[in-house]
Amino acid sequence: MVKYLSQSEAINVDQELFNDYKFSVDQLMELAGLSCAHAISKCFPTDKYGRVLICCGPGNNGGDGLVCARHLALMGYTPTIYYPKPTAKPLYENLSHQCKLMEICRVEDCPAINEAASNFDLIVDALFGFSFKPPVRAEFVAIVELMQQTTLPIASVDIPSGWDVEKGKVNDSDLEPDLLISLTAPKICARNFKGRYHYLGGRFVPPALQRKYDLNLPTYPGNELCLKL
């Protein structure tokens, strides 16, 4: 059975990828975001879910969302980015610049529920990653509340926003995504996931690292970048 990682284990795996295996942050982010786009395309085809609101947070999870937006655009979707607190670092500025030159729309204000329902078919939740600890900060409350209340399907990147990485939902009102894309390996909170689709993405974990942490990851079929758990 595939291993579900604690918060500390997820951090340690990431640090070993960076420090021991010499992966760069942007290298892993590109692979993670690309795998998210592939998982979304498998579950939500463009003919029914072409208009996508991608909600990006300030850290690596948000970076994954920016990469995902670019690849979804190349796949024929019409992504719109909501990025309430951009990170002032070259990596994130470059990702934002790429999206701008790809003519991907960006909204400055969180859409109201009715506005979101009229303008979008799907929401991608790329706000918080496995380093998140509740409660949600003030600048993200509006978008988290939108995702909690909307009837649109939601695809969460690695961790559903607002969830505790190990305990899962903190409150009964916390969002319930339709698709969860676990990156590298699923986190403990994913055991509480009740949505329709659970995918694994991030096909970059070296065999030795898999053995060290007993990840027991399933084998990706052929040239697939994601697989259904």
UniProtKB/Swiss-Prot annotation:
Pfam families: YjeF_N. Gene3D superfamilies: YjeF N-terminal domain. (6S)-NADPHX binds at residues 60-64, 129-135, 158. The keyword Amino-acid biosynthesis does not apply. Its EC number is 5.1.99.6. It comes from the Eukaryota. Catalyzes the epimerization of the S- and R-forms of NAD(P)HX, a damaged form of NAD(P)H that is a result of enzymatic or heat-dependent hydration. This is a prerequisite for the S-specific NAD(P)H-hydrate dehydratase to allow the repair of both epimers of NAD(P)HX. Belongs to the NnrE/AIBP family. This is NAD(P)H-hydrate epimerase.
